[in-house]
Every structure is written in C-alpha cells, then in structure tokens.
Amino acid sequence: MIKITLKDGKVMEFEEGIKISDIAMKISPALYKKALAAKIDGETVDLMTELHKDSSLEILTFEDEMGKWALRHTGSHMLAQAVKRLYPEVKLAIGPAIDTGFYYDFEADFTFTPEMLEKIEAEIKKIIKENHKLERFELPREEAIKLMKEKNEDYKVELIEDLPEGEVISFYKQGDFTDLCAGPHVPSTGKVKSVKLLSLAGAYWRGDENNKMLQRIYGTAFTKKSELDEYLNMIEEAKKRDHRKLGKELDLFSIHEEGPGFPFFHPKGMIVRNILESFWREEHTKAGYQEIRTPLILNEALWHQSGHWDHYKENMYFTNIDDDDYAIKPMNCPGGILVYKNSMHSYRDLPLRLSELGIVHRHELSGALHGLMRVRCFTQDDAHLYMTKEQIKEEVVGIIKLIDKFYKLFGFEYFVELSTRPEDSMGSDEDWEIATNGLREALDSIGKEYRVNEGDGAFYGPKIDFHLKDCIGRTWQCGTIQLDFQMPERFDLSYIGADGEKHRPVMVHRTIYGSVERFIGILIEQYAGAFPTWLAPVQVKLMNITDSQYDYLKKVEEALKENNIRVEIDTRNEKIGYKIREAQLQKVPYMLILGDKEVEAGKVAVRSRKDGDLGAISLEEFIEKIKNEIKNKTN
C-alpha cells in the first residue's frame, strides 16, 4: 500500500500502481468529472499516471491554472489534428498552451484564411464528439526520429535531434493523430467542451527571423460554452481598450521601426508618467525609503558574481569599453548592492530601505513585443531592503500594506501568490525554508489570502507575486516581494551586530508597478483612456462659442494655470457641439464652455465627462471642486 497526501492534508492509502483518475473517483465522483490533470509532489502530470510510492497529490480542474493549461494544450493538439485531416501536406511545428488559450505553428504552401479557420473549427468539434483518449508513449531517440521522418515532419525531427543522446522521447496519440509532446494532457478530447479559433499570424520558426516564416493559428478552449462566450465578450471589450490604439489616439506614446521595443513618450504621456513616479516617490519617502540611482552600464564581471549571467545572459545587451566587456543592466539589484557595500552598516541602521526607478534593458524576440506591455527597455520601480532575520516578517508586512495602498488607489482588485523553490535555484535547503516561512508568516499575520505556486520562485529565493484584476477580468502580474539570502552571500554583505561581530543581512527585492511602462499600459486599458482627473494629461478643455469671449477665456485659462490645473483651450472657429465631441473623444474630464451669458455673469458652464452638463457656476467654485478631486485622487 502507498500513502497519498491530499491538498487538504488528508492521507489516504491505495494499492501501488493505482491511476490518479481512480483516486479522483474515490475522493468524489463530482471531482472525477471535473478533473483535468494533477500535481504529484509539485509536478503536473496526466490523470492516467500510475502511482508507485508515497506522494502528495492535488487534483487539477479548470479552476486551476495548470488545469486550464492541460486542457488548452490538448486544444492545440486537436487544432493540429484537424489541420492534418483537412490539409495532409501541411507540416507541424510547435503548439503550446499560453495564458489565454493556445496556438500551433504550421508550414503550408498556401495561406490560411478566416474561411479556412471556420472549416478547421468545425473539424475540431467533430474531434471533440469522437472523444479520443489521449495516450502517452515513449520511444528511444533514434526510433522517435524515424517515426517523425516517416510522417515527413521535419520540424519535429529537428526538435528531437536537439535533445541529448539517450534521451527518451514522449509522444501523445489521439485517434489517427500522433504528436511529439512532453504533456500533460486531459484524458480525452471530449473533455474540451468549447473551442474557438481566434486569429492568424506569422511566426518565425523558433522565434528567429533568420528562419522560415510559419503560419500561426491562435485559439482558446473552455469546459463550458458560457465561459467561452464570456471570454469572447472580454476580447471585444479589450479591443476597444487596447492601449496601443488609445495611446495613439490620445497622443500618449509611440513606437517606431527605428527602435522596436523602445517606447517614445509624448508630452501627454510624460505627464501621466511623471505623476505616477512623483506619487511613488512621495509614498516611499513617507514609508522610510531612500532613493538611489545606479548606472545603466556595468562591468560584465558583476553579472557573473550576481548569478544573473547564468540565468539572463541570452536576454542581455553588451558593449566593449577600453577593451573590457560591459553589460547594459537587465536588473537593478547588483548596482543597488554596490551602494549598500559602499558603507559599513550597524544593526542600528537596519532595516535599510533603498528605492530606485531604474531603467533596465532586456532583449525580447521581435514577435513577443507588444506596445508598452512587452518592451526591451523599461523602468523598474525597484526597492531593495536589507534587514536582520528577525525583521523579515515586519518588513514584508510593511511592503504588503504599501502595495495594497497603491492598487486600491487605482481601483484594482488583486490576488496573491506565494512561489516556492524552483529546480534551477541557488542556496541551501535551510535558507530556502527560512525564507519561504518568513513570507508565509507575513501573509498569515495580516490574514491575506494567497495561493501557493510550487516551484515558481526566483532562482535566488521565494517570492510573493501580486496579480491585478482589471475591470474586464484580465489579470496582470505586477508587484513582487522576493526574499534573498543568496546575493548577500555572493557579495559578502555584512553589518555589525550588537555583539560587535559581522553578520550577514537578509535582502528583499520588491516592486509595486513592476514596470512603469507596462503599468501605464494597464492603466490606459483599465480606464479605457479616461484617466481620473488627478492623473489626466489634460484636466480641463476650455472653449468659447464665438470670438467675443476670447479675452474672458484667456483670463479663465490663466486662473486655472495659477492653480496648477492642466488646461487646453479650443478657440477654433467651429461649432461648439463639434468642440465638445472632440474633447469627449480625448477623454478630458471637464469642459468649460464660455458664451456671452457666462462672460456677463462671470461664470463658466461646466460639462463633466462622467456626469454630463453641470450648469453654470463661478470659476472659484469650479476651481475648488476640481482641486479637491485632484487632492483626494478620486477615481
């Protein structure tokens, strides 16, 4: 008999060799029906996996991220199966699950069309009804190559040949279709209830523009049609809110072919950016942080010492200065560590909180670039805190409260994830246990709900990730708190303790916005470009009906500017209705309309983006109203 420990801590005994699907049935028929995959000792596996030793087990459903992933991974195989049925000459490349669905890359001597997608989707629905079992099998490397050559699948052969000699290669078979794959998958194609093919795109093989351009078909999959319908509605809403579209319409930023992945911020975009950064600085000063600035370019040796070389080398940019090799920083932490190391510290100096709005560069493949969301150059709102082990809990609680304050201000709900030690990690088991428990205790002490994401920590320590939920239900990972025992060791950091001896500090890496650029992109989409008054690039649009109000308009403009209200004037010889519509399209919070009546009464006619016509009031009254709104940062 073997002992299986369930997620809730309950221990059950079973015969050795039992399949996970059978355990799911014994736990609950309802769970068996919903089950898609499972985690055994933290590793995601198929439900048909047999268990031969004591293990921890978590049954995954569509409510779990890896459950979704397994279902959508199967969706990609069904897409490939449908394409091969309809167009046997097409060659298969790769087809993974992604955050919102799946895709598959194909080589074809024709171009897929939207009409062909409808035909392929109909074939997928047949495959769902056929309810094929997904069967995993393994072959030695040479036999795997032979199988794929027989099927004329050149890309699969290349993938296998890149694997080490002696590697056992896994495949999945469903009906008449077999694909090279590590899995996991759901038990049968019938588990995938609703599929929608969404779009077509080009994609270079292996993301390398020197390779052949393939055709990529994107799709998504759900266990219920209602969930699919909800997702499709969200996509339509997301198109309206696309920050790339709104960024252009509102003149906030642009991206040019001379610098793909390097955003250009326009004057209005800089207003938003500067407000966010000023607010960030104010709140950090209140919370006891000290701001630093570290260089963009640092000697390559520093990145070897920090360990980033082994993990980030492929995503770094390099240069040579005076015959020595340098790197453009992909992260701020090694530079911040040098600032700490520059002085001797006492236990009385700790915790030391150093913050930095530091520009970093990371190489992203051209196909992955996406407006402000995925760029090659961005500003990371970093802070690095140095403390004793006894201060971990209190400091992490303080960070969580600060992050909470920021996200609530912008109207975001969020959920928290505690990510534990990955396979590719540095440090001792003891340090990892202390670090993970420190984060867990901080979350528990303030009653913050969280989920555990096994094996997804940083290479130097466990972390808490904050996932924002926007107004249309999408999630964005922004803030993070990462506990680190490794960097202080690598850089020989120390402080003098109460005993007069040197001690090693604990280091915490922390962000709130994550990337300032990305956070601006998220805010554009969250607000659909209609920023709250305190954040709006233009807070008031001032417009006259005829030229006779021009002098009064200039006086009003001057009064608004004296009160630090961001105002633009529209004195064009256009109908007032046209001017109002244009201001509305520009998402300006307030319009002040000046006609002869307003001039005579010394008032302004106020139109609110949110509430419509507010009538005529004195300029002093309006200034007081808008200043209160700005001061209170009303959303």
From Swiss-Prot:
SMART domains, per the entry: tRNA_SAD
Region (Catalytic): 242-532
Reactions listed under catalytic activity: tRNA(Thr) + L-threonine + ATP = L-threonyl-tRNA(Thr) + AMP + diphosphate + H(+)
Cofactor dependency: Zn(2+)
GO cellular component assignments: cytoplasm
GO BP annotations listed: threonyl-tRNA aminoacylation
Binding, Zn(2+): C333, H384, H509
Sequence intervals crossing the membrane: none
UniProt KW Lipoprotein keyword: no
Chief place of localization: cytoplasm
Cofactor binding mode and count: Binds 1 zinc ion per subunit.
Subcellular location: Cytoplasm
Keywords per UniProt: Aminoacyl-tRNA synthetase, ATP-binding, Cytoplasm, Ligase, Metal-binding, Nucleotide-binding, Protein biosynthesis, RNA-binding, tRNA-binding, Zinc
Residue ranges of every copy of the TGS domain listed in the record: 1-61
Oligomer status and interactors: Homodimer.
Function as written in the Swiss-Prot or TrEMBL entry: Catalyzes the attachment of threonine to tRNA(Thr) in a two-step reaction: L-threonine is first activated by ATP to form Thr-AMP and then transferred to the acceptor end of tRNA(Thr). Also edits incorrectly charged L-seryl-tRNA(Thr).
Family: Belongs to the class-II aminoacyl-tRNA synthetase family.
UniProt name for this protein: Threonine--tRNA ligase
Organism: Clostridium botulinum (strain Hall / ATCC 3502 / NCTC 13319 / Type A)
Lineage per the UniProt record: Bacteria, Bacillati, Bacillota, Clostridia, Eubacteriales
